[in-house]
Amino acid sequence: MYINTHDSIFGAGNHKTFTFLYIISLHSSYKLFHFLKMQQNTNVVFKLEVDERKKKKAMKIVCGFSGVTSLNVMEEGKLTVTGEFDNYEMTKKLKKICKHVAIIAAEPIREPEQNRNPVTRREPNREPEQNRSRVTRREPSREPEPNRAPLARRESRPRTHSRPSIPHARPSRVRGENSDGCIIM
């Protein structure tokens, strides 16, 4: 198959053109056809008539294909292959080892559909911060009480500053089998 194309490099005004000649052999186009024919994520079940030794060889050949994601061999001579591969090429390779190879089932694996309307959780109606806040301590009143003594009135005022508390080391006694009850400071 010959394809001739003319293409101008420098635009329509220039007379320099180049001719590209593509020669595509039938063999390479055949392989290209099968490469493009590869199905995505297929599940193929082969029926094989083999003994244990040839079953291991068949598994080795199938594992050698690129795109095979899983392989399952059953006792009845069924071989289940999952992945992205060419069914025709795999059958051709298996026929070199086994006497009889047949494709029982070939189906594409469908990905689970995502839910178009995802479930959203409803958030409870929240009240404004002012209503939610709880008073945890009693606020001292600013108005002086007439029935209290003047010292009691002074104590009811809120403190503006406080002294930091200094932790004091407590003496501890060590008691044990070999100790005589000494005090450590």
From Swiss-Prot:
Lipid-anchored residues (S-farnesyl cysteine): 182
GO MF entries: metal ion binding
Region described as Disordered: spans on this chain: 109-185
Record has Metal-binding as a keyword: yes
Key words of the record: Lipoprotein, Metal-binding, Methylation, Prenylation
Highest taxon above the source species: Eukaryota
Keyword Cytoplasm: no
Ranges for domain HMA: 39-106
Function: Probable heavy-metal-binding protein.
Family: Belongs to the HIPP family.
Record's protein name: Heavy metal-associated isoprenylated plant protein 11
Organism: Arabidopsis thaliana
